[in-house]
Amino acid sequence: MCIRDRLKSAAKYGKNELLTRFDIPFYKRKGYEHTYLGPSVYNSVKYSFRYSDRLYAGVVAEKDAGEPFGALHNRYGYDYYSFYLLLKDCGRLKALAVGNYRLSFGQGLVISTDYLMGKTIYASSFNNRSGRIKKHSSSDEYNYFRGVAATVALSKDWDLSGFYSHRLLDGVITDGAITSIYKTGLHRSQKEADKKNLFTMQLTGGNVSYQHNRIRLGITGIYYLFNQPYEPELTGYSKYNLHGNNFYNLGIDYAYRWHRFSFQGETAIGKQGWASLNRLQYSPVQNTQIMLIHRFYSYNYWAMFAHSFGEGSTTQNEQGYYIGMETSPFAYWKFFASFDLFSFPWKKYRVNKPSRGTDGLLQATFTPRSHLSMYLKYRYKRKERDWTGSKGTLTLPIFHHQLRYRLNYSLGDVLSSRTTLDYNHFHSQDRAANKGYQVTQMISSQLPWARLFADVQGSYFFTDDYDSRVYASESGLLYTFYTPSFQGRGFRCSVRFRYELNKHWLFITKFGETVYLDRNEIGSGNDLICGNKKADVQMQLRIKF
């Protein structure tokens, strides 16, 4: 009855949105001469329907640059199609997802398809993700599940979640075995197209959670299998990686709050190894937070869909202690400091033995006025890396210092400015230091009466090599995040216009160009660009009805 009434109300009061995007480059990569099968234009179309915050539905279609449209392996038009339906809070049914969806339970040691933006940002917004079923409305072609998932309230304190997924994956099959899984979603060349949808993966599992007053407990389990054995080459640092054709992970998550203390964690096991992450947060006084995080990911623990806090990109082969503190002891000032001590019990990429490292960060933010703010951030990181020289291959420490100053200023609602200065210093034992500099200026203007908004940004960068590279975040299109990196010497400029004709029509266009002053070629291989300039334009149209 609830679902029928919800659909009737949705048909009458629901909101529709159509969003399309085009990216057009003004340069030609080498791959378009003989290798890539389609045009260099990127295009996506997204239709979404929403009723309040309780019903979502949508379709996504996407073609990456270089992929054919309506031809060859994409004879049905786009390279990627996605459908999703999410129903929330319908009586005892707390969530029901059909089509493409995402999952996150506990601290992510068993399963999490959330987007994480780095260790420091993750720690500062570290929350338990127990019982979250979400729609997959992005054009990400790998990090999702396809099937059905649901959460039901068994009682006031107990929730039960279950899910099933069946989907095709890209990869390489050799002699009847899967030797690699291809995660980029790119099918531009015949070689890439031959990897498309070669094998299937089925996954099923569930979560039981209990929450009463200050206590929260949960158990999450998943079982997944491929239709062919997964047998990648296991040598060196990858010796303990995933292999076989059926796998499982089981985890227990827990949380408890007492006065100013908050404790959360999860412990999980797999076919081999185990992992545990525990976090204690304490607020001694108002406007002060102290956080302690301990993680232990054994070298032979493997969870294909895990994503959690750490220095590395996987919840494997890492252990460490993290402490962070944020405080505002007096008016206008905010301070953040953190220190992470970590180690890797087994080999890693470019490190042929167990290694260790440290990561420290200090940031001071000063906001004397609502229209004026600034911060100074310093980060120090020490890790180890293999270096090959006259004495053979040695594992030596490397040191990375990063310094950033940013000033934000606004002149009413019409004009705002952001100035950023970056400095990088990278060196290793017995080797000369490499340095990187960057100056970035952004000016944003708003004309509300004309419904026109404009951003102009320019950067000058000068780095010695890749290790001393710099980053610059830019305003972009809706639902996108763009932070390119630069190495060498040159400048980058971008201009973005956003025009709202009315509450139904929105148009955004962005032009960007990067010019290198120290080279006549950009990139390598099929991505090689002849010349020192790289320019493109992006356009996006949104229609609400």
Locate predicted features.
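Surface-exposed loop/turn segments flanking beta-strands in extracellular/periplasmic regions
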Residues: M117-N128, T174-Q190, S475-T480
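Outer membrane beta-barrel
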Residues: R75-G131, S137-D170, N287-M304, A450-Y466
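Outer-membrane beta-barrel translocator/receptor signature
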Residues: Y27-V45, F49-A57, A61-E67, H73-Y81, ...
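Exposed, low-structure sequence patches enriched in small/polar residues
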Residues: Y36-S40, M201-P232, K239-F545
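Aromatic- and glycine-enriched pocket-lining scaffold segments that form the walls
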Residues: Y142-R188, N197-S209
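Short, small-residue-biased leader/transition segments that mark boundaries at the very start
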Residues: M1-I3
